[in-house]
Amino acid sequence: MQCLARKDNNMTDLTRELVDAVGDAFNANDIDAVMQYFASDATFDHAVGPDAHGVRFEGADVIRGVFAGLFEKVENVHWETLDCALTATKAYCEYRRTAHHRDGKTEEYLSVDILTFKDGLIIHKDTYYKQRS
């Protein structure tokens, strides 16, 4: 998955290569590869949940469980990057997410991730996506 980034003049820490590597790990559906990019105290705010921020998952072990569960539930899931903008510490990425479930169903929707980085690791992943009705 390639980040089609617009460079921000303030960009010092975050690189397109790092964001692309995170995306590649997710697209490989490889939980160990994904988790190497998360800080131990990272948080993940899911798009859905009872709170304004959705359901919040705290800590790398909890986040690992969330994504491992996704990878186990589907044959594969792929995020196609539609656009990505970087600042010094944040990546704002638009995706087309397609999941092929083991029962033969395909799920597709548009999503946005806001990834906040510190020292080369994700400290906060905030996800938004379109709801079909």
Spans of model-derived segments:
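Short, low-complexity N-terminal intrinsically disordered segments enriched in polar/charged residues
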Residues: 1-40
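A beta-strand edge to alpha-helix "cap/lid" segment located at domain peripheries
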Residues: 6-14, 64, 68-133
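Residues at structural and domain junctions
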Residues: 8, 20, 28, 49-53, ...
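Generic signal for short, ordered secondary-structure residues
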Residues: 12-14, 20-21, 42, 46-49, ...
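Acidic side chains
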Residues: 27-32, 45, 113, 126
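A solvent-exposed, acidic/Ser-Thr-rich amphipathic alpha-helical stretch
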Residues: 31-82, 86-88
